[in-house]
Swiss-Prot record:
NCBIfam families the UniProt entry points to: apgM, PRK04135.1
Parts forming coiled coils: none
Transmembrane portions of the chain: none
Cross-referenced Pfam families: Metalloenzyme, PhosphMutase
CDD domains associated with the record: iPGM_like
Protein name (record): Probable 2,3-bisphosphoglycerate-independent phosphoglycerate mutase
Gene Ontology molecular functions: metal ion binding; phosphoglycerate mutase activity
Record gene name: apgM
Pathway: Carbohydrate degradation; glycolysis; pyruvate from D-glyceraldehyde 3-phosphate: step 3/5
Top-rank taxon, per record: Bacteria
Protein function: Catalyzes the interconversion of 2-phosphoglycerate and 3-phosphoglycerate.
UniProt KW Transmembrane keyword: no
Catalytic activity: (2R)-2-phosphoglycerate = (2R)-3-phosphoglycerate
Organism: Thermotoga neapolitana (strain ATCC 49049 / DSM 4359 / NBRC 107923 / NS-E)
Keywords: Glycolysis, Isomerase
Amino acid sequence: MLDKQKFVSKLVTTNDTKIVLLVMDGLGDIPVNGKTPLQAASTPNLDSLAKESDLGQTVPVLPGITPGSGPGHLSLFGYDPIKYQIGRGILEALGIGVEVGEKDVVARANFATWDGNVVLDRRAGRPATEESAKVVQLLSEKIKKIEDVEITFYPGKEHRFVVKFTGEGLGDRVTDADPQKEGHPMVWAEGLDEPSKKTARIANELIRKIAEVLKDNPKINFALIRGFSKYPDLPKFPEIYKLRAGAIATYPMYRGLAKLVGMEIIETGQTVEDEINTLKEKWNDFDFFYVHVKKTDSYGEDGKFDEKVKVIEEVDRVIPEILALKPDVLVITGDHSTPVPLKAHSWHPVPLLIWSRYTRRGLSQAFNEFECARGTLGTIHASDVMTLALAYAGRLEKFGA
């Protein structure tokens, strides 16, 4: 089978063009009362940009397959998400600066609420980051080792934290200790090979110990652990595409993914405006910028239509600031769809906009799911987005005589 990434890499050339990939996490949606959040939002700048752009829609993995954020992003970065399957734990861990060694398995965890059988809230009401950090500190003091495996906790954002398991004979082929839906009984971790069975056993015992330590907390009284992973070996983005690549993201997982593929992590603030200010400050330092906006996904998962609309409008307001930097290529898309009615990731194609001097402009009137479905790019695999970005930037040689 053709390795598209290797094929494209052989055609890559260098020049002084700049590419911006703006990812609005979970952007795609389905109509509520006749409109999607993208349609309902006031987006004069995105709509104006759409008139000068090529539009389409992407499939992150395969038609009908619902992707996680990891596969969705890997695909956007030009990697085959089926070939390179990466646990979410390593992404979250790298994103918050955790050192991961050969004897380590890391996993992403959520604080949760349960009643002793059923998981009532998979995010424990989304506690503030500061509150979660105090709980992580308590766990660090109470739980240090299970059997011969050292346990280390690291706080993340809101309800999220990272667990590192350090010991001999640990595997990462472990199913998630998470029912994935609220109102369902707990689903415990299972190992798919002998080393991973040990990891699963330790993880399940850890969850029981966490529940014991937190039994008097009315909301944060349980944990879900998933995305077990060791450090994977991936080809590096800057080497494949000959780009100085910088990542601007506020959430650890996305910083971790960017770091894993070899991008440089650029420190930034917590808001969209902070991220754009960082883009301006670092504009001369990189050829390629990955800019990530998280809240479109968060509000989709929470079923909050109006809030998702507001985030889209917030992004729309900064589009002129991005264009003022005069990028040669601006790509705006999502890593997957997170429809408000579903309150979850979905299989729906993802809106895609590519702006450059070389687009077939004038064929689209607005940026939304339905205009994108009719767009000039058609429906493409998300792993082809990087190839297109390079082509629009004049960074690919002709193939063949």
